[in-house]
């Protein structure tokens, strides 16, 4: 089913994280099985509490072969090069075969993958 015809199911952060982990999205990206594209990289002028100055807020798009969008995640890149929070990307959107999982704060869908 094309992504534009799949229903969107809004779920909790825990549910989307479980599915992201089950699908091994970050592991597959690190192995080169998925393309990982940095879509946004913004320096935080006023970082949230507990996040150091000079931290960047990043949106990452994960693509399967054939340029099919699989996932969208957010992460804080700390000044030392490590990731803030849990130390892992925070999934916001996950494209499954029959539906799209999303959290309400999700980044907008890629223009070609609405």
Predicted regions and their residues:
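Catalytic toxin/effector domains delivered as secreted proteins or via bacterial secretion systems
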Residues: 2-114
